[in-house]
């Protein structure tokens, strides 16, 4: 793939090959077990990230916005003899200084799917305490154990407060 850094921007473009061998571990949204099969995908992607944070860890001001676009095919042109399906992923977060000890950290994530037939492996899913625990596009959802399939379009928000105790020691509360 191709990567280019221009000041606070990072641009990426490329293609990837993915192969999935499904067993009987996947379930549809109606609760029925999906039939075992295998799929291969030839995917194209573009990504643009703007990062103005002052620090990599515990930033005090700035923002990070990432926009990604994907087109999924099975032969490089079509998917299942039809038009390919796609997705757009947006992740935006910022650090706002309220005073010398308190910081407000809002965040917004979304994943939008487009197309006629989207296989179960690329459906939106959520669960666990961290992003990308089982699948790269899995969104964290503290109250959900394991992984659950979601609707085609998902938008989530998070608001966190950070308190600097002393020096490099912080407490963060998020919800």
For every predicted segment, state its role.
Residues 4-8, 39, 55-60:
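Edge/loop elements at the starts and ends of beta-strands within beta-rich repeat scaffolds
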Residues 28, 32-34, 48, 54:
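A charged, amphipathic alpha-helical module
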Residues 2-3, 37, 148:
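Generic alpha-helical structural element
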Residues 1-33:
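Transmembrane beta-barrel wall of Gram-negative outer-membrane proteins
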Residues 34-36, 41-44:
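Aspartyl protease catalytic domain
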Residues 18, 22, 27-31, 64, ...:
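Generic preference for flexible, low-structure residues
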Residues 44-49, 53-166, 171:
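C-terminal outer-membrane beta-barrel translocator/porin domains of Gram-negative envelope proteins
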Residues 1-3, 168, 173:
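Gram-negative (and chloroplast) outer-membrane scaffold detector with strong preference
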């Amino acid at each position: 793939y191709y990567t280019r850094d221009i000041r606070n921007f990072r641009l990426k473009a490329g293609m990837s090959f993915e192969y999935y061998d499904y067993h009987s571990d996947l379930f549809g949204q109606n609760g029925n077990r999906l039939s075992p099969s295998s799929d291969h995908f030839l995917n194209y992607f573009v990504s643009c990230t703007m990062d103005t944070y002052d620090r990599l860890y515990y930033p005090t001001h700035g923002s990070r916005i990432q926009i990604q676009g994907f087109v999924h095919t099975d032969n490089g042109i079509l998917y299942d003899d039809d038009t390919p399906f796609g997705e757009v992923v947006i992740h935006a977060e910022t650090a706002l200084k309220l005073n010398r000890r308190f910081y407000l950290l809002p965040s917004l994530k979304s994943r939008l799917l487009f197309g006629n037939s989207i296989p179960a492996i690329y459906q939106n899913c959520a669960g666990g305490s961290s992003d990308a625990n089982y699948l790269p596009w899995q969104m964290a959802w503290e109250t959900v154990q394991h992984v659950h399939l979601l609707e085609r379009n998902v938008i989530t928000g998070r608001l966190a407060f950070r308190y600097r105790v002393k020096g490099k020691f912080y407490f963060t509360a998020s919800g």
